[in-house]
Amino acid sequence: MGKRLRVQRHGRGTPQWRNRGHLRVAPGRYPSPEVLKLDETYEGYVVELKHDPGRWVPLAHIVIPNVADFWIPAAEGMYTGQKVQIGPNAAPVNGNILPLYAIPEGTQIFNVEIRPGDGGKLARSGGAYAILVGKSGNSAIIQLPSGKVKQVNAKARATIGIAAGAGRDEKPLLKAGNAYYKWKAKAKKWPVVRGVAMNAVNHPHGGGNHQSPGYPTTVARNAPPGQKVGHIAARCTGRGCKQAKARLGLK
């Protein structure tokens, strides 16, 4: 009998796969509309900038006296003691939080909500930003870091500027140990070993005198867990797959 696959062990959810949430500083979200009214403007200040393990962007601790204190992804150039305005009447300057309908078109924004009150869902990683392309009625159109254009609610909040932490990928890891600790902070299993490099007892693609599955790797959608690896329920595979999809009108 073969050993359990990586995906089977992952699905069981033992501690080695669980997110190290107890090390996190805070969720990094905007306060709910019950705490900060969407139609009112507040003024706070940055108390602290802190690294959050497992997150690609530092967090800023914002305090609004006698109202709220919260952590959000910091903007590039944000500093301790900086005044931050939150609301529709806030100035559209770096670090301030405004609803999309109050932000000029063409502005760089990050930590963008999809719906008012969800706390921020888009462009949250270090160095990421979206661009407000246009506004129409109750909707706003933004261009995401991927280049995709998305329509969101115009009352959704966003932070002006670019998320801090840009350039983190420019420093090389240099050795495998650094990569190990990098992914350990995010509860990601590393390194990921290919199935064909394993022994036959460890994986359906393992074994043999050379690294090849030795048979077609397409498996059924309802295949049992120990067998369900490779091209799952694939319509086509190989060189002619792209042409076949084009003939069928598929993406």
Curated annotation (Swiss-Prot):
InterPro entries: NA-bd_OB-fold, Rib_uL2_dom2, Ribosomal_uL2, Ribosomal_uL2_arc_euk, Ribosomal_uL2_C, Ribosomal_uL2_dom3, Ribosomal_uL2_RNA-bd_dom, Translation_prot_SH3-like_sf. The keyword Cell inner membrane does not apply. Keywords: Ribonucleoprotein, Ribosomal protein, RNA-binding, rRNA-binding. Residues 1-12 have a biased composition (Basic residues). Residues 1-22 are annotated as: Disordered. GO terms for molecular function: rRNA binding; structural constituent of ribosome. One of its GO terms (biological process) is cytoplasmic translation. Pfam families: Ribosomal_L2 (PF00181), Ribosomal_L2_C (PF03947). GO terms for cellular component: cytosolic large ribosomal subunit. Part of the 50S ribosomal subunit. Forms a bridge to the 30S subunit in the 70S ribosome. Belongs to the universal ribosomal protein uL2 family. HAMAP family: Ribosomal_uL2_A. NCBIfam families: PRK09612.1. One of the primary rRNA binding proteins. Required for association of the 30S and 50S subunits to form the 70S ribosome, for tRNA binding and peptide bond formation. It has been suggested to have peptidyltransferase activity; this is somewhat controversial. Makes several contacts with the 16S rRNA in the 70S ribosome. This is Large ribosomal subunit protein uL2. It comes from Ignicoccus hospitalis (strain KIN4/I / DSM 18386 / JCM 14125). The gene is rpl2.
